[in-house]
Amino acid sequence: NTPDWKFQSDVVSHIKSKFNKQINLAVDVCMCSTTLDGHCCILDKPQTTQALFIDLGRKLKQAGADILAPSDMQKDTVKNLKIETQLPILSYIKFRSNFYSSFRDLANSTPSSERFYQISVADPHSAKIIASQYDKDGADYLMLKPGMTTIDLISMIKCNTYKPVGVYQVSDEYLGLPTDKHLYETYQIFDRVGCNFMVTYGARKL
């Protein structure tokens, strides 16, 4: 069945109605929580995938999203969302990682097979190529995920694209921090290497 994205739209609308222009709301664009196999796309159906993402992007814009953040790692998603919504795009550069396991267990989105469209942790060259492509496709911001395991790529991608580059401190990274002081230290490290922004479950503690 085609999702109607009502839950996503309602959440965005509620947040924006409460905070209005006090915040810029960046909203994740993906479908891993709606597919039966836990994948970020409809496997082997790129046109269907893009049609769904465009539909989701339009509805998120109508609900009040300020920035769209596609995390699917599919070809043309950044370009299509930029053209169809005219919103700023924050594009993920996502690696296949074991550090997502806690979130996947909680969201019941563990994929039925390997997410081959994500980048191998042993292949930094692909991250450089993908970042450059997203830049050409119209991305306004780039974000590496996970954070700590991609820290060596931040400077390179910033130099190649001249775009703000941030990190996503994922579930297993965050759960491994025993105190708020440990959290703040990771923030200082990301800032030290030139990270422009940081997404973390502990944002309110910083």
Question: What is each stretch, according to the model?
Answer:
Residues 1-206:
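Alpha/beta enzyme core
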